[in-house]
From Swiss-Prot:
GO terms for biological process: defense response. The record marks G57 as: Reactive site. Belongs to the cystatin family. Phytocystatin subfamily. It comes from the Eukaryota. A motif (Secondary area of contact) lies at residues 102-106. Pfam families: SQAPI. Residues 57-147 form the Cystatin domain. This is Cysteine proteinase inhibitor 2.
Length: 151
């Protein structure tokens, strides 16, 4: 009798000895165990090294075209409006230039925005907005001009 069959018999005999019904059909099924040698095809190794999905905690560029997405533009408007109310400023959003994101109990959005200053000059700012959409929560974390960045 093979070792795997002995294992199956001992499991079912022990179960029967414990007062449970014995399943004769399963006792006859040999148990096969597969052991991995840790080796695989080169394609499997390469696939294992490829990043999957979003890295939690890492800041990454948003997919192309996200700058014109309605949700992103609304976040940028929110950031400019919050900054204006806190700093008593009169900036106007012109466009979203770049979007980066970070997963942190929601999303931290890093928005590079072009704004028009009261004098008429356009300038680039970096806005950092924390959003938890499922709670309808968003908060401006930071809003600062990019050094020597005139659009």
């Amino acid at each position: 009798m093979r070792a795997s069959s002995l294992f199956a018999e001992s499991v079912f005999t022990t179960s029967a000895a414990a007062g449970r019904r014995r399943c004769p059909r399963l006792a006859a099924v040999p148990v096969t165990l597969f052991f991995s040698t840790g080796r695989g095809s080169p394609a499997m190794a390469e696939e294992a090294q490829q990043p999957r999905g979003v890295k939690v905690g890492g800041i990454h560029d948003a997919p192309a075209g996200r700058e014109n997405d309605l949700t992103t533009v609304e976040l940028a408007r929110f950031a400019v409006a919050e900054h204006n109310s806190k700093a008593n400023a009169m900036l106007e959003l012109e466009r979203v230039v770049k979007v980066r994101q970070q997963v942190v109990g929601g999303f931290m959005h890093y928005l590079t925005v072009e704004v028009k200053e009261p004098g008429g000059a356009n300038k680039l700012y970096e806005a950092k907005v924390w959003e938890r959409a499922w709670e309808n929560f968003k908060q401006l974390q930071d809003f600062k001009p990019l050094d020597d960045a005139t659009a």
